[in-house]
């Protein structure tokens, strides 16, 4: 444990929250470095952190800077992450190398879960999880997020899986791995930009307090792995399923034609979707993350009250 702590650096706010047993919610950093252009990425990150504070919890955005796993970012850290041109996108396989080489790294869903667990943080808010890519039966392109969800004990609040993915196969994978996927006020898996996907959920709850009960019970039963809380984008910000699917299909063809795959595929596709929707998808992305941040903070606060 002493060896681990030499690699971890807490922001002043997070350090104080840990000392005072306050509820903490982790945030990923790939959305800042690879998911949105500057300065929207900084504005979004600071707004989301404030939403978490407004709902009674402390935000902890996670990134790797100068050989340290930063749990909570100071403003100068955020600027480095948002403006650097060579930020590595870090998943489980890359974590040791990026820390050892003292590079700047942005954490994916998988790595944010790992680092949150190292720091004792049980809740993590993101836009959408990764999953099984379309055509994975030929390419085997499956996000490491799914494997991480099967073994790391962090509850992830998201707007479902990213809509560029094969959602039925993603759900099959999570079911095989024993990962609970719980809809928040919905019986259908949300698909990031849209509230509906056509994929039905077996579990749905209506309140943050009920999610807190499930989180704590799972923990007390020593069941390995995370929980996915699927929180649909608010009605007023959702895009239509037919509209976004047509645009995604165009973007997928462009990626294939340009030979873009692996970890580069998601940023390319999301960038193309922003371009083809004239920025509507970027606005929707920001709103769904804000919505997830409010719910994540409420769940963390509800769990803290039960302890």
Curated annotation (Swiss-Prot):
Protein name in UniProt: Pseudouridine-5'-phosphate glycosidase
EC number: 4.2.1.70
An annotated GO BP: nucleobase catabolic process
Assembly description: Homotrimer.
Any one of the GO CC terms: cytoplasm
Cofactor: Mn(2+)
PANTHER family named in the record: CARBOHYDRATE KINASE PFKB DOMAIN-CONTAINING PROTEIN, ZGC:136858
Location of the active site: 28 (proton donor), 162 (nucleophile)
Function of the molecule: Catalyzes the reversible cleavage of pseudouridine 5'-phosphate (PsiMP) to ribose 5-phosphate and uracil. Functions biologically in the cleavage direction, as part of a pseudouridine degradation pathway.
Keywords noted in UniProt: Glycosidase, Hydrolase, Lyase, Manganese, Metal-binding
Keyword Transferase: no
Disulfide bridge positions per record: none
């Amino acid at each position: 444990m002493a060896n681990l702590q030499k690699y971890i650096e807490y922001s002043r706010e997070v350090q104080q929250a840990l000392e005072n047993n306050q509820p903490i919610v982790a945030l990923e950093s790939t959305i800042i470095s690879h998911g949105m252009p500057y300065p929207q990425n900084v504005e979004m990150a600071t707004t989301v952190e404030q939403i978490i504070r407004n709902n009674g919890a402390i935000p902890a955005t996670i990134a790797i800077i100068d050989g340290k796993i930063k749990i909570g970012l100071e403003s100068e850290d955020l600027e480095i992450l948002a403006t650097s041109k060579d930020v590595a996108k870090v998943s489980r396989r890359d974590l040791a190398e990026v820390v050892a080489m003292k590079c700047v790294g942005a954490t994916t869903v998988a790595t944010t879960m790992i680092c949150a667990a190292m720091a004792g943080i049980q809740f993590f808010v993101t836009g959408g999880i990764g999953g099984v890519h379309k055509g994975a039966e030929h390419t085997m392109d499956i996000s490491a997020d799914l494997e991480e969800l099967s073994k790391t004990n962090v509850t992830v609040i998201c707007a479902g899986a990213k809509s560029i993915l094969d959602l039925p196969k993603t759900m099959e994978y999570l079911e095989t791995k024993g990962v609970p996927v719980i809809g928040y006020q919905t019986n259908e898996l949300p698909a990031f930009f849209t509230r509906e996907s056509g994929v039905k959920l077996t579990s749905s709850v209506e309140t943050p307090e009920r999610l807190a009960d499930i989180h704590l019970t799972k923990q007390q039963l020593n069941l390995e792995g995370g929980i996915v809380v699927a929180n649909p984008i608010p009605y007023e910000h959702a895009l239509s399923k037919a509209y976004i699917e047509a645009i995604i299909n165009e973007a997928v063809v462009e990626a294939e034609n340009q030979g873009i795959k692996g970890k580069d595929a998601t940023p390319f596709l999301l960038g193309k979707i922003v371009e083809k929707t004239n920025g509507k998808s970027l606005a929707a992305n920001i709103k769904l993350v804000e919505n997830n941040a409010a719910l994540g903070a409420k769940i963390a606060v509800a769990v803290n009250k039960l302890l």
